[in-house]
């Protein structure tokens, strides 16, 4: 993207987020800020900054929250507008370039921005790509359905850095924790000479914070496709906070009592036989 490397602030990792925080600290609160990307990260970033009093524009591309159902999208849009976020979406809202003080859209419009935040897409560490093992286009290790590298049975991957059968799961805490447990089970099975089990991963939805006092919970099928059902407002914020606390307490419990972690399971994925186990 022309100008993105020079003039936009990514927020994909801690160091990038620190750079952004420093830039915002030097910016007057009334100065315009643009957030590019309308996935959960972009939505949450726009909401947090607007709640602090920032003048925020969320540049969505074609649609706000592509994953969301219509009710979920309405819930998010309503809260963002309450916070004062200007939402730009539609066919002409793709970003064409980033300039020092503006975001240029595909239809020629310019969105004034003294700090442009780039939230479009996640990255992964380059360890797998540097290893010489096969990866997908963004560097996730290609594995079979037991999370074992298709090139080396001694290597197991989990979480955001794994691409089982070339069809990775959504980058999320909801996937990473169960994949970590299943990767451990794969290692234990191989140590004793057993055949590891294929991953079984179920999703329940997606939690989006909209500032400190509200949120949206998008309910999904177990295959991670959205249902036309959502929870909004303060209740959604409380649910997400409870989930975050439960995640931390679950990790602590697993450390005290190994094997105590449980997760919601679905049937085998359609890709389960796509890549043979090494």
Language-model-detected regions and their locations in the chain:
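A conserved beta-strand/loop capping segment in the N-terminal third of enzymes
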Residues: 1-4
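A conserved FAD-binding loop/helix module that cradles the flavin
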Residues: 129, 161-211
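FAD-site-proximal beta/loop scaffold in flavoenzymes
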Residues: 6-30, 110-178
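A Rossmann-like FAD-binding core segment of flavoenzymes
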Residues: 52-145
């Amino acid at each position: 993207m022309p100008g993105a490397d020079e003039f936009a602030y990514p927020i994909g990792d801690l160091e990038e987020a620190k750079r952004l925080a420093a830039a915002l600290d030097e910016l007057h609160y009334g100065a315009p800020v643009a957030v590019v990307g309308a996935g959960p990260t972009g939505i949450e970033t726009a909401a947090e900054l607007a709640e602090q009093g920032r003048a925020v524009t969320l540049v969505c591309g074609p649609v706000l929250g592509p994953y969301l159902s219509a009710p979920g999208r309405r819930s998010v849009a309503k809260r963002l507008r309450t916070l004062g976020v200007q939402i730009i979406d539609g066919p002409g809202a793709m970003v064409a370039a980033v300039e020092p003080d503006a975001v240029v859209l595909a239809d020629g419009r310019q969105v004034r921005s003294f700090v442009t935040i780039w939230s479009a897409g996640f990255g992964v560490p380059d360890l797998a790509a540097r290893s010489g093992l096969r990866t997908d286009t963004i560097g996730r290790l290609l594995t079979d359905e037991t999370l074992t590298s298709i090139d080396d049975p001694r290597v197991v991957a989990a979480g955001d850095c794994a691409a089982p059968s070339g069809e990775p799961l959504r980058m999320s805490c909801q996937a990473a924790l169960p994949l970590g447990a299943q990767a451990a089970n794969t290692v234990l099975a191989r140590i004793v000479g057993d055949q590891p089990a294929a991953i079984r991963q179920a999703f329940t939805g997606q939690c989006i914070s909209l500032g400190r006092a509200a949120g949206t919970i998008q309910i999904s099928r177990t295959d991670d496709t959205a249902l036309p059902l959502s929870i909004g407002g303060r209740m959604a914020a409380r649910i997400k906070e409870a989930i975050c606390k439960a995640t931390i307490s679950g990790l602590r419990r697993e450390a005290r009592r190994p094997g105590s972690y449980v997760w919601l399971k679905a049937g085998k994925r359609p890709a389960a036989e796509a890549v043979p186990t090494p």
